[in-house]
């Protein structure tokens, strides 16, 4: 269990502070007294913001815009018309989620119509039965199948799809890790197809990169969702190449409504089981290798990262199948005896026993302090049910403080065995507000508002799904806490933009670009 409380770094904080830190040492060691006099006269005791500070630092310290402005790119490709929502705006998030759901449903239906025969041959006719149960015509009462049997079929089919995706990822990763001469014919073909997709993705990212401005956090946008999914999908389960409708594991699950059937019959919400359409590490790698080929080992790392996300989903569905369904069956039988219900139907009371509170579902839950809400907000990030972990990430942008803490696990109907360690969300939240109250940088008004906020529960502003693994999410959170350079890039612009950038850095990660400047050469030609 860990806890970190740290001051946030911004561009334009007092340069006096900067000159007493590592920067000052570099001034004396790198350039000498002449440059030192120049720096002191130019900077004085004033505050230098943004790009000017960046330029002066780069002259003094020899860093490529040194400890300052570079190109910061969000490790996510946004589809046309998509934008990162403000975490404190539930309406903005809700609208985006609904539009995305409708688009995905339409695209998944195309996959079912196009590949139905191949999919049912590969994964069994149960998929069709599950789809008909949800969307098909009403049958005679005698022909209606037992609901519990249908639930088991949906869970088994979903597990089959995830296992197939996991094994294909493993084959591709193994092929990429082998020497080219040692690959089999199938592996050569697989690697060649994957390389073609990466090249297409690389050229699309390159076009976007050329048009980027230097001084803000950037998003790679403009690819249509169909092309993006086809280009970034490592191993399509059915269909190959750059087809516009590729039968990925995610698309097959959506097309046959497996999660919806499981939710409708058992009350178990599996909407958190997702994998990134495009693995963030592949974007980071592509941005690094601008004018050269990406080595096979780097591609293998990205494939293995995606495989980890798929394996997490496999473990989650196995947890539901082995731990939860037997309990479900037992409670179902008890309810039948009490209520005298017929065998074929699952009573709604059974489903309600497996509902869990919204704030404990595996998502990013967003809260704000009741007063000074624009500045003081925090995320409660909950892992998958089989891991049963969570962490707290709080920000006070008024006094530039960040607080990260691992929390104790929750008890609920879908969780794993409990371990008593760590603190609760309420305890972490109260300590976080105490920081703001006791900080020397807090104004009297801000401190009073935080005292009032501490006495009541924070405002719950809704939840968001995350596509990456919980481990990757936690690593992103810790990077936001530790990485001064990243903080400088996300804490710029209007307050709502800073919150968007923080959310983007948490959900996807950020790659900061910039090459080192040859300082002696720079000064010689100045």
From Swiss-Prot:
Keywords in alphabetical order: Capsid protein, Outer capsid protein, Viral penetration into host cytoplasm, Viral penetration via permeabilization of host membrane, Virion, Virus entry into host cell
Subcellular location: Virion
Record's GO cellular component terms: viral outer capsid
Lineage, top ranks: Viruses, Riboviria, Orthornavirae, Duplornaviricota, Resentoviricetes
Gene that encodes the chain: Segment-6
Native source species: Bluetongue virus 10 (isolate USA) (BTV 10)
The UniProt record lists the keyword Ubl conjugation: no
GO molecular function: structural molecule activity
Family the UniProt entry places it in: Belongs to the orbivirus VP5 family.
Any single biological process term in GO: symbiont entry into host cell via permeabilization of host membrane
A UniProt-annotated Pfam family: Orbi_VP5
Name of the molecule in the record: Outer capsid protein VP5
Start and end residues of each stretch annotated as Involved in membrane permeabilization: 1-42
Function of the protein: VP5 protein is one of the two proteins (with VP2) which constitute the virus particle outer capsid. Acts as a membrane permeabilization protein that mediates release of viral particles from endosomal compartments into the cytoplasm. Permeabilization activity is probably negatively regulated by VP2 and is triggered by endosomal degradation of VP2 and exposure to low pH.
Key word Oxidoreductase present: no
